Amino acid sequence: MRHAVLGAGGVGGLIAAALAEDGQDVILVLRAETLEVYPGGIHLESEVVGDIDVDVPAVGRLDREVEVLWVAVKATQLEDALRAASPAVAGNALVIPLLNGVDHVSRLREVFGDLVVPGAIRVESERVGPAHIVQTSPFAAVDLAPPPALRSRAEAVAGELQSAGLSCNVRDSEAEVLWGKLAVLAPFALATSSVQLPAAGVRADPVTSRLMLASMREVGEVAATQGAQLDPAIYETALLNMPAGMRSSMQKDLAAGRALELEAISGPILRLGREHGIPTPATEELVRRVGAAQAL
């Protein structure tokens, strides 16, 4: 298939390099400042697919029809990224967002209509230099939740990711894919960022660990109002078994002084909690602590 990847950070770079190394036709769509220093190929160090050096062409604006458009930018960068990928150029491409949070899906549907296939990725991966991606988690797993009319096309995409060495499953429930990720991501990102410690450090801190698990249960209650039935025992196990050294992308952004995806990750939980009368005190406290850490 012909793939375009919008954004070449930890997630976009991983997807692009793995697919290109496996022989797929891949092009990157990059911001001007990233394109300026792009060396013409990706160097990937990955615990899942191994080390890869592969040439991948890049442009500043999508300039050709593709079959799949991966949206792999930060939520804070989405509006700028959309200006570089016109639906008129993308044609009939499946649009697969791998952003954190849930609110981006409705925005993408405003632009691309029924071609959006919501997705989620579980991975620790970061860009450490121009086109230099380091993926350190022992897993890199993608879930896709296509509408019925796009299921066969999504299954073909999943097959290509699997051929490239990444885990990919096609699920029936969009709500469970998006909220299932958020049930782990939000508590973990907020907890690790609030104390600037990796997973093991959070687990060793009784107060932060308690807040993290309580936040996870709050996310589950909110998720139920959106049609996602999540088993809290599964997500508690996931949080308590994160690799000891694993850090969240929010934690890394905070340490580097970059903009945080705080609204994208915590906003839907707090907003929908208020709308449905569901208390979210643990999530609120973690958000407060992240804000305090950000102000230092």
Regions found by a protein language model. Give the residues of each.
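NAD(P)-dependent Rossmann-like dehydrogenase/reductase catalytic/cofactor-binding core
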Residues: 213-296
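Internal alpha-helical scaffold of NAD(P)-dependent oxidoreductase catalytic cores
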Residues: 87-88, 107-114, 119, 130-181, ...
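Short, well-ordered alpha-helices that flank and scaffold nucleotide-derived cofactor binding pockets
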Residues: 17, 21, 83-87, 106, ...
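NAD(P)+-binding Rossmann beta1-loop-alpha1 motif at the extreme N-terminus of oxidoreductases
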Residues: 1-51
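Short, charged/polar "capping" segments at the starts of alpha-helices
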Residues: 34-39, 105-106, 152
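Rossmann-like NAD(P)(H) cofactor-binding subdomain of soluble oxidoreductases
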Residues: 49-132
